[in-house]
Amino acid sequence: MCMSQFPIEFQIECAASTINHARDIYAKFILQPLSYTQALTMGNSLRRVLLSELESISITAVRIAGASHELATLKGVREDVLQIMLNLKQIVWRGQLKKQPTITRLKVQGPAIVTAAAFQSEANSSANIIDTCQYIATIDTQDILEMECQLEQSSGYRLAKPSEMIDWLPIDGVFMPVKRVNFWVDKALVDKVLVDKALHLEIWTNGSISPQEALHQAARILTHWFNPLQTLEWKTSHTKNEQTMAQLSNMLIEELDLSVRAYNCLKRAQIHSVADLMQYTQEELLALKNFGQKSVEEVNKALEQKLHCQLKKYVD
C-alpha cells in the first residue's frame, strides 16, 4: 500500500455548534484534506457507528402500582398506563451504570403534574436525567402514583421482551444517543486555496452526549475494530487438501475394511493404496470386472467414514 495516498497534515474543525434544547444538540465538523474515496469511506463508516454502536441508558421495564397490563387505567391519573410508558420512553439519561439493571423509583401524591424530576435512583447509581421537565402524567385527585423503572445500558434499539419479573411491563430500549447524522464531500479550503476534498459531518444528539464526544467514541470504536487487521499472522500450515493427500498416500485399502469381493476386485486392478483408489472415478470403477454399483457405494461409504471424502462420479 502506498502511504503517500494519505494526507500528511490531517485537520478537523468544529465549524458550528448549537444547543437547541437540553435533548437536542447539534454540531458540524469539517475533516480535510482528503481524497474523495477517503472522505466517502470515513463518512459512511462514522455515520453507521454513530447511529448504531454508541451506548446509552434507557428504561426497559416498569412496575406501576395498581397496573397489571399496558391497557390498564389508574385511579385519579389522566393518562392510561400505555401513555405513561410512552412518556417514560422519552426520558433521556446520562452517565454510566455501575450495575445492570439499576432500579429508579417515583412516588407522587396528587393533585400534581408528574415530571422526570420525581425519580429517585439507587444511591450507587451515576445515571442522571437530562431534562427533568420531561412530562410523565397528571394526577387530578389526591391519589398516589407510584412506580419502579428498570434502567439498562446498551447500544442500538431493542424491542421489548416479556419480563420474567412479576408485574413488570417491558418497554422498548432506545440506546441511541445520536439522533441523526448527515455528511457530504466538498472541496477543501486550505490557506485560502482549494485543494483535494473535505468531509462535512453533521451530528445531532439527544443531550446525553455531546456531538464532539460522540465523534470521539465513534473513531475509537472504528480504531478498535481495524487495529487487529494490522497485525494479522497467517499460518503456513498445510492446507486441508494437503493433509488429506498425505493420509491417502500412507493408507492401504486394507484399512478401509471392505468386503472380500470389493477388496479382491481392487487388488486385481493393481489398486493397493487409497491414493491409488482416489485416481479412479465411480464410473471407472464400474468398468472393472465384477465391480458393481453396490461395491462403489461401499467404497464411498468407507472413504466418508475414514477420510471424509468420496470418489468423483465422472472424469472432469
UniProtKB/Swiss-Prot annotation:
Q: Give the residue ranges for region: Alpha N-terminal domain (alpha-NTD).
A: 1-233
Which Pfam families does the UniProt record give? RNA_pol_A_bac, RNA_pol_A_CTD, RNA_pol_L
Cellular component, GO, one term: chloroplast
Give the EC number(s) listed in the UniProt record.
Answer: 2.7.7.6
**Annotated HAMAP family:** RNApol_bact_RpoA (MF_00059)
Q: Which keywords accompany this UniProt record? A: Chloroplast, DNA-directed RNA polymerase, Nucleotidyltransferase, Plastid, Transcription, Transferase
Location in or out of the cell: Plastid, Chloroplast
Task of the protein: DNA-dependent RNA polymerase catalyzes the transcription of DNA into RNA using the four ribonucleoside triphosphates as substrates.
Q: Where is this region: Alpha C-terminal domain (alpha-CTD)?
A: 245-316
One GO biological-process annotation of the entry reads:
DNA-templated transcription
User: Record's domain comment?
Assistant: The N-terminal domain is essential for RNAP assembly and basal transcription, whereas the C-terminal domain is involved in interaction with transcriptional regulators and with upstream promoter elements.
Task: State the family it belongs to.
Answer: Belongs to the RNA polymerase alpha chain family.
Q: What is this protein called?
A: DNA-directed RNA polymerase subunit alpha
> In terms of domain of life, where is this protein from?
Eukaryota
A GO term, aspect molecular function: DNA-directed RNA polymerase activity
**Subunit:** In plastids the minimal PEP RNA polymerase catalytic core is composed of four subunits: alpha, beta, beta', and beta''. When a (nuclear-encoded) sigma factor is associated with the core the holoenzyme is formed, which can initiate transcription.
Q: Mind telling me which NCBIfam families this protein's record contains? A: PRK05182.2-5 (NF003519), rpoA (TIGR02027)
Q: Which reaction does it catalyse?
A: RNA(n) + a ribonucleoside 5'-triphosphate = RNA(n+1) + diphosphate
